[in-house]
Amino acid sequence: MREELKGIFASVFGEKEGLRFFFAPGRVNLIGEHTDYNGGHVFPCALTMGTYAAVAERNDGLVRMYSDNFRNAGIKECSLDDIRYQKEDDWANYPKGVIYEFQQRGYAVPHGFDIVFSGNIPNGAGLSSSASIELLMGVVLQSYFHPEVDALELVKMAQHAENHFIGVNCGIMDQFAIGMGKKHHAMLLNCDTLDYEYSKLNVSGLALVIANTNKKRTLADSSYNTRRQECNDALLDLKKGLDIAALGDIKPSDFDAHSSLIQNETNRRRAKHAVYENHRAIKTAHMFKENNIDEIGQLMKESHLSLKDDYEVTCPELDELVFAAWDHEGVIGSRMTGAGFGGCTISIVKDEFVDDFIQKVGDRYQEKTGLRADFYVADIGEGARELKGE
């Protein structure tokens, strides 16, 4: 990848000495969807696919950025003394937001740089290409200027940038999984306390297969922020009878006993999903430790149905992919992953059935929707970092 990045960099900015190389992964969430901003648990892992960068220092205050994934957009430029969100900068607002966040927290960025990005995360697939770019930019600034900033602070800064600079009310899961990822491990993360534990995925004989619906979706334009508000409204109702700070504080049995406090029926269903999905995420992490694969498959099924019926963030394309997967003999479990409204599914498939799964599920999906799905056999990798000798 280094040689490829060098070539792109030279063609865009000319050849420069002292190039440094960085990588930030994408992420996939095995279970625990739309729980992160509800103070619940998630169970994500970092992928080996992600975003790469080649960086050269400048001796002025100019930052020049180019993405090989958005070639037609050309070079995006900004000055370090005037970092602002500009709609026409599109993808470049994500790294700009992280630069701005460093500056706002008193971490000086003394000079600019030229940077080339190149990613192999499908854009809009729900595998967190945006958070990948944010953490990548964070690691660049950390490595060049502020080694005292630890990984957890980088994660928080990237999330804050997306919330306040980009204007997407995301939880912390994406940035956390990408910043703190560990090879061959998922992490059970409490999104309220940020307590976490790594869980080695004993998936011998099994493969994680990501399927991209290729249904166009953009998170900021979807109903994401609406769902967040509905959950907040439900929480306010529940607080009238329960001493809780977040939906993630409630056990399913307590929710069932007090759900009538929630006046609005739609909000009640949203909250039910958040409470039960939090329980499913915790249980799934335990099931991986016990190697209880069949129970994991059942929990994934329950998760998808809850996202479909109670949270209403699936779509016909996601449902078709998941239903086709459930009908395949080699599948342990399958569900939508990510924010929904399009994007990807994650399936646990027996190794010997992977090729047949991709063929048959892909054919059935195309027949039902007219769209061709893309499939990726996922490898679980390390978090965002500078590539030194890799």
From Swiss-Prot:
Site (Transition state stabilizer): R27
Annotated residues for binding of ATP: S67, G124, A125, G126, L127, S128, S129, S130
Top-level taxon of the source organism: Bacteria
Keywords, comma-separated and alphabetical: ATP-binding, Carbohydrate metabolism, Cytoplasm, Galactose metabolism, Kinase, Magnesium, Metal-binding, Nucleotide-binding, Transferase
Subcellular localization, as worded in the UniProt entry: Cytoplasm
Catalytic function, reaction form: alpha-D-galactose + ATP = alpha-D-galactose 1-phosphate + ADP + H(+)
Enzyme Commission code(s) on record: 2.7.1.6
Stretch forming the signal peptide: none
Residues holding substrate: E33, H34, T35, D36, Y224
InterPro entries (alphabetical): Galactokinase, Galactokinase_bac, Galactokinase_CS, GalKase_N, GHMP_kinase_C_dom, GHMP_kinase_C_sf, GHMP_kinase_N_dom, GHMP_knse_ATP-bd_CS
Enzyme class: transferase
Biochemical pathway: Carbohydrate metabolism; galactose metabolism
Molecular function terms from GO: ATP binding; galactokinase activity; magnesium ion binding
Active site per database record: D174
Binding annotation for Mg(2+): S130, E162
Pfam family, one: GHMP_kinases_N
Main location class: cytoplasm
BP GO annotations: galactose metabolic process
Gene Ontology cellular-component terms listed: cytosol
Coiled-coil ranges from the UniProt annotation: none
Sequence similarity: Belongs to the GHMP kinase family. GalK subfamily.
Annotated function: Catalyzes the transfer of the gamma-phosphate of ATP to D-galactose to form alpha-D-galactose-1-phosphate (Gal-1-P).
Protein name as annotated: Galactokinase
Organism: Bacillus subtilis (strain 168)
